[in-house]
Amino acid sequence: MLAQFKHRPLATILFAASAAFAWATGAAAQSGEPIKIGYSMAMTGGLGGNGKSALLAQKIWEEETNAKGGLLGRPVKLIYYDDKSTPSEVPAIYTKLLDVDKVDLVIGAYATAMLAPAMPIVMSKNKVFIGLLGLAVNSEFNYPNYFVMIPSGPVPKPAFTKGFFNIAMAQNPKPTTVAIVAADQEFSRNASDGARENAKAAGLQIVYDKSYPPSTTDFGPIVRAIQATNADLVVVCSYPPDSIGMVRAVNEIGYKPKMIGGAMVGLQATAIKTQLGALLSGWVNYDFWLPVPKMQFPGVADLMAKYQARAPGEGVDALGYYMA
C-alpha cells in the first residue's frame, strides 16, 4: 500500500533523536549522568498491543546503545508512562516528563491520536519532537521542530490510501463509486481527508462519507447503510478495536463490494490476523514493512531476530513487522 516509501526499524526514531541531541550539546555535554529520553506509550487500551510491541524494540535499542558505551560517553535511559490509548492522558504525561523528570529529549507517543495532544506541550518548551507513526499531525501546528517516522512522504493525507486507489483503478471495468467511513478521531479524520482527495482525483463519485464515534461496538448498522449505496469501493479508516468490528460485521452481513480496506490500523498485528483468519480474505489494506528482499535494510534482520526471540516472554506481537 505504501510501497513507494521506505520503512526503517522503529529503533531509528531513537537513533535520530539521540543524534539530534549529540549535535545540539557537543562534546562538552559528556558526563556520567544518563541522557534521559521521555515519552508516553500506549501499553493498555485499544492501541496497547501495538504500543507494547514498539516498547520492546525501544528497550532493545536502549540495551544495545548502553552496551556500546552509550552516547557521548553517557548511558541512555528511557522514561515512559502508559497513556492508556487515551488522548486526554497525554498532556499531563509530557508536562511531567519535561517539568518533573527533566528529560533531555522527548519523542512521540504511538499513533496520531496520542501525538496531537502532546504537540502544544512540546511546542511551549521549544523542544525537538520526533513522532511515531503519526499521520499529518503537524498539518495544523506547522511546528518547525517536529519530525515523524512514518513512510507517508511530504503530503501524508492522500499518500496513506494512494496505494488502495491505485489498485482499485487498475481494475477492468474501473470502479465508479466509493464509500468512505471513519472513526471520529484524529488519525481517521486525516486518513479520510486523504481518501477524499484520492477519490476526487480518480473521478470517483463518493456515495457515502460518514464518521462514527470511537466508542462504537456494533458496526452492523454502519455496514448495512454502506451496502445500501451499492458502492464499488469502501475505504475504512479505523483503529484496532473498530477494525476488528468492521471486518466481523462485513462478513456476518455477507457484504461484498469490489474492494474494501484502505486505512485500517490493527490488521497488521499477528494476533489479530490469527484471530480473524479467513475473515480477512479479500481485504486490501496497508502495511509498512514485510520481510521481502528490497526491505532488508542494514540492521533489520538482527533487530527482528532479537525482537522475535524476546516477544513470547514479553507478551507482544510475535513477528513485530509493524511496530518494531
Question: Which residues does each predicted region cover?
Answer:
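Extracytoplasmic "Venus flytrap"
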Residues: 35-59, 81-88, 110-111, 181-190, ...
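Surface-exposed patches in mature extracellular/periplasmic domains of secreted proteins
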Residues: 73-76, 105-108, 176-180, 314-321
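Residues that mark the start of a beta-strand
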Residues: 34-36, 176-177, 232-233
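Short, low-complexity disordered leader/linker segments with a strong preference
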Residues: 1-36
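Signal peptide-proximal N-terminal region
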Residues: 30-32, 56-78, 169-173, 200-203
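Extracellular/periplasmic periplasmic-binding protein-like sensory domains
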Residues: 151, 250-323
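Extracytoplasmic ligand/sensor domains, especially the bilobed periplasmic-binding protein
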Residues: 103-208, 258-285
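Beta-alpha junction/loop-to-helix N-cap segments that form part of ligand/metal-binding clefts
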Residues: 34-36, 49-56, 68-141, 149, ...
